[in-house]
């Protein structure tokens, strides 16, 4: 299995999984994808169903990941997934349980049973194990430079804290996260963790990360890698839970006609991109529903064919803050597939059109028609009032308390439910404890606090303020990172 860049030219070399694991962004500014997606036949899915039932989620994940990874021995890969997906790190032995959301006609895939109560743990726990394995094998070290709108940062830091050969520099948008999210990150005092509050929004943080990655000399000197969803291994981990979701919703003997549709609360497009990849592999996923908040750039694209990222000033601060994103970094991976895996066409859209015009327009093209007909996408959006009403309604009808982002998903799911046949699964994003103020506003009471999080907001915190400057960020990395530590 070899990997290519979404902006590849005819002479661009392919890379191995272990190389791109540590590299993150491709040198040409593109994102890595497999040369071709492996396929899962009905018999493959039947076998994975047996493995999931008898051996558990970690063994099933190893079977899927092995299709994409041929430079890590199978036994080592199985051990890696077993360490990543274990109890008590995950509070439910199923890792990803799926159940019916009573009274709604919907299912809910529970992705928030990990250490930080967010779906990002599903990828980060695996990434931490893969990084440590590969760095030990090479006798190397890595500086992770990442950006977070709320959940990626804490998930990455909990997965990587104290690991040999790894330093983490995590950028956050100052004042844009909840008190719980800030406490989860800033209370980590490990020497290999550097928390940074940037004067800007998440997209500014993400741009700084990309700028550091585009400086080839600095990247090589400081061994810069990525945990954001620009890292292919993140998406690979997420593909696994879409397979598990389909297996858990369908019956024994289900075939390609047993479609399961999913609703994915979306900001950076990584989560739903993993659903797209699972669908391309042959997992019988029906409609892929992109659910956005008021920062509805993705909804605009799927409705009109126009992709128009907003400026930092025009990115709204909402009550589902982890989706306050207007430049969806993983979107390029899907567009590459949509454009027939044409690197030149993808580069023309993301380098030329966006830089020149601030948008690109696929309306009226065969590609726009293919969004729904070939790739199964549709979308919807949710407002502050919508998510508050949904949190209150679902608690009253189902006895289940949603976090604001999952509430966006359930709101959109109710809207599209009449047009979709078969099971419709909302992919949960986090536990409500992370968003206490919004839960209080919606329901009149605070969310329950799991025992492992009691007192977290009163702990000592450490964070470094930073101007929105790539040179200032590089200076901070030089000052705070210990090479080889």
Language model features: what each stretch is:
Residues 1-485:
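PLP-dependent amino-acid enzyme catalytic core
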